C-alpha cells in the first residue's frame, strides 16, 4: 500500500521557521517526482515546490510565492520528503500536503497525504 504521511506543522510567529516531513512507503521513492501543495483558508490548492526523481538528479522547482524562503529536499535512505520553511508570513497559513507526481500518457498527482496544518500568527 502506498502511503504519504505529513508531519511538522504547528503555530509559528511571523518570520519564524518550520520543517515539514512527508514519510513515504509502498513505492520506490527515488523513481518519482514528489511535490508540496498547500491550501490556504478559503483559497484553491496551490502548488509550491517539486523535487524531481533520481533520473533528473533530484532537481527542485518552486513557485514564485515561496522561492528563496522554502527549500524542498529528500532523505533517500529513509524515503522522506522535507520542506524547510523560513521567513514565514501570515499568508503561508495553510494545510500543507505532499503528493506523488505520476506520469504516463499525461501527468497528475496520484497519491496524497492527509496534510499538516501550518498557522503563522503572532
UniProtKB/Swiss-Prot annotation:
GO MF: antigen binding
Residue stretches making up the Ig-like domain: 1-114
InterPro entries: Ig-like_dom, Ig-like_dom_sf, Ig-like_fold, Ig_sub, Ig_V-set, IgHV
GO cellular component: extracellular region; immunoglobulin complex
GO BP, sorted A to Z: immunoglobulin mediated immune response
Transmembrane regions: none
UniProt keyword terms in alphabetical order: Adaptive immunity, Immunity, Immunoglobulin
Keyword Plastid attached: no
Keyword Heme: no
Pfam families reported for this sequence: V-set
SMART domains, alphabetized: IG (SM00409), IGv (SM00406)
Disulphides: none
Miscellaneous information on this protein: This chain was isolated from a myeloma protein that binds phosphorylcholine.
The protein's name in its UniProt record: Ig heavy chain V region M511
Species the sequence originates in: Mus musculus
Amino acid at each position: 500500500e502506498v502511503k504519504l504521511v505529513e508531519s511538522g506543522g504547528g503555530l509559528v510567529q511571523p518570520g519564524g521557521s518550520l520543517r515539514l516531513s512527508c514519510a513515504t512507503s509502498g513505492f520506490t521513492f527515488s523513481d518519482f517526482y514528489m511535490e508540496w501543495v498547500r491550501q490556504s483558508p478559503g483559497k484553491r490548492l496551490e502548488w509550491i515546490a517539486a523535487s524531481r526523481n533520481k533520473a533528473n538528479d533530484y532537481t527542485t522547482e518552486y513557485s514564485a510565492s515561496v522561492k528563496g524562503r522554502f527549500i524542498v529536499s529528500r532523505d533517500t535512505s529513509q524515503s522522506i520528503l522535507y520542506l524547510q520553511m523560513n521567513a514565514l508570513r501570515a499568508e503561508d497559513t495553510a494545510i500543507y500536503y505532499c503528493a506523488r507526481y505520476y506520469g504516463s500518457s499525461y501527468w497528475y498527482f496520484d497519491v496524497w497525504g492527509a496534510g499538516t496544518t501550518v498557522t503563522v500568527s503572532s
